[in-house]
């Protein structure tokens, strides 16, 4: 028996929507990264983009456990010597683009390279409850029901 290898033309990509309200950031990010890569499918092939298109809504209502909201820092470099800026998760979540916390969490769980960039293109994160992808008829996935640790009352 030969090892099965999926061809890009054979892959059927689904659209899924996940409501992040009250979900723990890290646990949500691991499940989303698995979906984006296609590792939840029996036809998973490492060199083919066989993952789903994932839509995350209510990203600004995702929660951290412990004191990570105040203590976790995100760094960025401006390009000038000595200009490394840092912001806490709380500052980002209360700022203009709260969806960046989830985007960064998922991005850091995806391999870096050409295929990883394509897979990250299949992720759409929105801070509020609305998204413009109703025409794709996305399937709703309830992450909270998978494990009681996936949610946190905050």
Curated annotation (Swiss-Prot):
Keywords (A to Z) from UniProt: Ribonucleoprotein, Ribosomal protein
Single Gene Ontology BP annotation: negative regulation of translation
Residue ranges crossing the lipid bilayer per the database entry: none
CC annotations in GO: cytosolic large ribosomal subunit
GO molecular function: mRNA binding; structural constituent of ribosome
Gene3D superfamilies, sorted: Ribosomal protein L13
Function recorded in the entry: This protein is one of the early assembly proteins of the 50S ribosomal subunit, although it is not seen to bind rRNA by itself. It is important during the early stages of 50S assembly.
HAMAP family with a match to the protein in the record: Ribosomal_uL13
Subunit-level organization: Part of the 50S ribosomal subunit.
PANTHER family: LARGE RIBOSOMAL SUBUNIT PROTEIN UL13M, RIBOSOMAL PROTEIN L13
The family this protein is said to belong to: Belongs to the universal ribosomal protein uL13 family.
Protein name, as recorded: Large ribosomal subunit protein uL13
Organism: Bradyrhizobium sp. (strain ORS 278)
UniProt gene name: rplM
